[in-house]
Amino acid sequence: MSDKILRIATRRSPLALWQAEYVQRRLIACHPGLRVELLPMVTRGDVILDTPLAKVGGKGLFVKELEQAMLSGSADIAVHSMKDVPVAFPPGLGLVAICEREDPHDAFVSHHYTSVDSLPQGAIVGTSSLRRQCQLSARRPDLVIRSLRGNVGTRLGKLDAGEYDAIILAVAGLKRLGLGDRIRQVMPAEESLPAVGQGAVGIECRLDDIQTIALLAALNHSETACRVSAERAMNTRLEGGCQVPIGSYALLEDDQLWLRGLVGSPDGNEMVRGERRGPRADAEKMGISLAEELLENGARDILAAVYQGNPPA
C-alpha cells in the first residue's frame, strides 16, 4: 500500500474537514508510511441553505457527491458525521468503521440565558432540526422556533448578530472545533434525546476494496459501533428520514445496552417514547423491537401524517 495514496472524500465545512483530518491522522498513526490525502467537495446540502433540509431531500444531500466520488474511483473512502448518513447505501458501498464517539448530546447556546427553562416567554430559538424543534415545542410551546441552516460558524454568527435569543447545536461539533466555551448547557437526554448516531464519525468504503477495509479496521470503536447499530436499526425499521422528528440514544455499561427512542410531530403536540434494555449482542434486535413498539403506540400515525405532506427522500 506504500505506493498508493488513500484518498478521503469530505465536505468542505470546517467540521467535516476536522473529521476527515482526524481519520487521516488516525490512519497514519496506525499505519506509518501510509499516504493519505483529502479530497474536499461541495455537496448539494452545503449549497441549498435557504430551505429546511426536510423539504429538499434530507440529510442524504450531504453524502451523495462523496459516494459518487468513491463509485467513480476518484476517492477511496468517505468520512461522515453519522447523524447525516441515510439508512441505506448505494450498491457496492457500505459503512466499514465507526470511530469513538464524542459527547452525543445537544448544546444550548445563548448570550443571556443558561438553559431552555430560563428563556422568557416568546423567545426566539434557532435550530435546523425537526427533532430538536419537536422536543423544544413540547417542553416550551410558547417559544418561537426559527429555522437555522449553515455551518457551525455561520449559526453562531447569526446568534451573535442578535437574530436569535438562543440556538441549539451538537455538543460534539462545538467541542471538535474548539468552541466548547460557547456551550451554556449540555442538554440531558431526558430534555433533548439526541439524533441517531450523533457525535460519531463513520467511514464509508467500496465493499470490494478489501485492502482499504483492512486498513480501516483499526479505527473501528466496538462500543460506539454497538450503540450506533442499535440506534440505526431502530431508525431503519421506522423508515425514518429527515422529515420526521426521530431521536434514538443508546448507552452501554459492561455488556448491557440501554436504548431510548422517540418519534414526534414537528409541532411537539404528539410524541411517542420507548426504551429497551438487553445484552449488547442483541443491539440490532433491540433497535427493531423498540421501533415496532413505537409504531404500535402511535408512531405509525405520526409518520403517515408527516409523510403525507413530505414524501420520504
Curated annotation (Swiss-Prot):
Keyword Glycoprotein: no
Residues that bear S-(dipyrrolylmethanemethyl)cysteine: 242
Cofactor: dipyrromethane
Pathway membership: Porphyrin-containing compound metabolism; protoporphyrin-IX biosynthesis; coproporphyrinogen-III from 5-aminolevulinate: step 2/4
A molecular function (GO) term: hydroxymethylbilane synthase activity
Family: Belongs to the HMBS family.
Quaternary structure annotation from Swiss-Prot or TrEMBL: Monomer.
Alphabetical list of HAMAP family matching this protein: Porphobil_deam
Protein name according to UniProt: Porphobilinogen deaminase
Gene giving rise to this polypeptide: hemC
